[in-house]
Amino acid sequence: MVTQRHIPAAQADPEDLLKRSGLPTFFAVNQPETLPLVRPARGPGQHVRVWARSLSGMQKECIVASALGTIWRLASDEGPYLDGFDAAPCPLAFMTVGMVSSYMNSLLAVANARELAIRHLTLVQDNRYTMEGSALQGTMTGGALPVGLEVQIGIDVGDDVVADLVQTAVCVSPLERLLRERHASRFSLTVDGREVPVGRVETLDSCAPPDPQRAFSQFALPVTTGVPISRLAAVTPVAGVAGGAHTSLQSKQRRTLHVRALCRRRHDGVKEIEQQLHSPLGSTFQFLSDEAPGQGGLGAAPDAASYMAAGVAFCFMTQLGRYATILKRELPKYGVAQDTCYSRGDASSAEDTSGTTGAVKTHVYLDTPEGAEFARDCVDMGEQTCFLHALYRTPLETMISITRV
């Protein structure tokens, strides 16, 4: 049983820092060499490093860097279900957008390798997650359900050829082994500037880099033009209904979450993705995604791997903040430095060259007067309730449907 403690009344109410900053929600970082942060090393696959910090309420921002592409600053918020300001997409949006973009990349690569001309292509992806148990008793657990992928395709070949095209594309995507295998996440923990042992989670045996909180505060971010991300439909806060206002802060829960994305490719090659949050009740956003030069794109927007990596970091951090809020404990600042790796299989090979994904490695930084034991509980419960760490640790299958158009 976890003991609750009331937060002192003097603690400031959350404020919409993303709106107040005046910065674009997403933007490419200009002059990345000025950042006091170490970029991921080049190697097999696409290594992605995320530095993220909490802002106010459920708002977070991150700098995400791939060894192959541009450095991006991304931001996330939550809707009325977590008493957020709804100023930016929710964490789960980033993973769904990255996944559907990755599937689109793989499908186009396989079609190109086989010299198949596609007239029309739209992907519709559905991600569902579960949350059950009590936060106060330490039994609340996040889960991930099989991914649904509908391929709407116009192409002048037979059904067998289309089916093989889609199956091969799914196989060579980095998501193939992310979903089919169990990946155990590893963590380190720094509390108030001092590294301490973790609790139940697996230990990350590597030196923790500098606290992202300090790194963010050391420079004013130089930016290029912000990548357009627009809200297509704003949610209306509703109380007393499933998925409505404040419902995700209840201490006992049994619910299913549903995120959908529709992905199309523009004439310039950039992918345009409409992300919908059906449960809990959330807003609809439009994302853009593009791969790096030399990887099939021009780097005009964040790539698939960057979105997926940012989603994991943002979702885990939401669980840290949510857990502290439910328990009424003080957690004024928190951040992560996270490493992930994704590798796409060979689209032109007749051999089995499945895409691969590495485990998530996360250095966690907490500033709290509650002590190291509470900090360890936060990390344990953060991993236990994080939907996207559940996605990594749960073997799943992609449920594919094909619609000829």
Task: Label each PLM-derived region with a short phrase.
Residues 99-103, 315-316:
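Alpha-helical metal-binding/catalytic segments enriched in His/Glu/Asp
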